[in-house]
Amino acid sequence: MRCLLILIAVTAAIAGSFAYLSLDLGQLFSMDAAAGMLRFMLTFFPPELSSAFLAKTAVGMLETLAVSAVGTLCAAVLGFGLALPASGLYGDALRAFSRLLLNLLRSIPELVWAALTVLAVGLGPFAGTLALALHTAGVLGRLFAEALENAPRAPARALADAGTPAALVFVYGTLPCVWPQFLAYILYRWENNIRVAAILGFVGAGGLGQMLYFELSLFHLSQACTVIIAMLALAAMVDTASAILRVDRHSQ
């Protein structure tokens, strides 16, 4: 009964959204719309393949990759630090405060964080790195906290009963149980962040996104096509690398 009520509520919300926005699906999927979209896409070709622009694009790819990697790493460290009290290890008061902080961090989208960090530290990749780190810390911190709360208690309890210090109980009793989950969460967020990092450039956070915004603003469509292809290639490479790392982890 509960599932039926949820299904009815979701269906009503979707139907109400279509009615409120007055969407005309007939125009969206019409032949004229498809032909217009195709003509627009063809204006981007052929891509710009001059050596100077390809070198510039390669630098943008490296910058975007660095922003996503460093941002994810900083987020993992900050998220782990907040996940410890959020999991209830240090009492209910710190648990409530940490969860509130994690909710705040992840409820603000990356683009909003980027707009704020650009105002704080100026244009460039540092602003993008901070934006990714702050939002992703909220996401990873909550996931880490849930993993810690659901970790098996038996190994930690056995070490504690043997007189092991609390820090070592956590390191040798709890952390090995949740580390595979932590690594999986970090890799998945890195996959997501490589795409987000490419978009953050639209608000001045550096990388391929900033290049794309610049080229589109000048209607350099061939150059924009090259940047878009670089974005797709970078995302595919990161997805492949992440998949290989996960396979290696499972095979060990």
What kind of feature is each model-predicted range?
Residues 68, 72-80, 84, 88, ...:
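Hydrophobic positions within alpha-helical transmembrane segments of bacterial inner-membrane proteins
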Residues 184, 225-252:
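C-terminal transmembrane helix and the adjacent membrane-cytosol boundary/short C-terminal tail
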Residues 102-136:
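Generic hydrophobic transmembrane alpha-helix motif, especially the helices
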Residues 58-66, 98-105, 187, 191, ...:
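Alpha-helical membrane-interface segments at transmembrane helix boundaries
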Residues 81-116, 143-146:
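Cytoplasmic-entry segments and transmembrane alpha-helices of multi-pass inner-membrane transporters
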Residues 48, 60, 64-72, 107-111, ...:
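Loop-to-transmembrane-helix entry motif
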Residues 1-73, 81, 85, 93, ...:
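N-terminal, non-cleaved signal-anchor transmembrane helix
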Residues 123-174, 180-189, 240-243:
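Membrane-cytosol interface at the C-terminal ends of specific transmembrane alpha-helices
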